[in-house]
Amino acid sequence: MINRTSLIDSKTVLDEAFSRIHAASRHEHAASLAVRHQRLDALDALLRDNMVRLCEAVSADFGHRSTHETRLLEIFPSLEGLRHTRRHLARWMKPEKRPVSLWFQPGRAEIRPQPLGCVGIINPWNYPIFLALGPLTAAFAAGNRSMLKMSELSPSTAALFAELA
């Protein structure tokens, strides 16, 4: 994760980070189900292990926001999204058969879900945990790598995400 609020060298930093992530995605074949589960499990553990720190960071960004509100509206839905994704991931990865026109018989057609490589996520300030982890969960489930840009209006949460990444 890039945690920059200055525009001075941010393009260079982003280009370097993207180059590393893109190169890694090109050298790795499509992530297996086990690898995707490992990434999702790591994200789940990160969220559970740092729940208090995340609530404190969000509260600092908002001036004060109730820990209960952050848990109820950001952390618990993120954990539920991770659980749902892990439960259905194997089915989502399977090829889907599609009908073939009579003209192309005896051919077969199917859609094979494949990762695209690197996903950029630009996160808003109002629900910084939930609105970052939802797309990040989807990117990891699809087998992609991701770059996450947190809002400059949530600096404490962005700094914590950068530390934990």
Question: Residue ranges of each PLM-predicted region?
Answer:
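Rossmann-like NAD(P) dinucleotide-binding subdomain of oxidoreductase/dehydrogenase enzymes
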Residues: 100-165
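N-terminal Rossmann-like NAD(P)+-binding subdomain of aldehyde/semialdehyde dehydrogenases
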Residues: 1-110
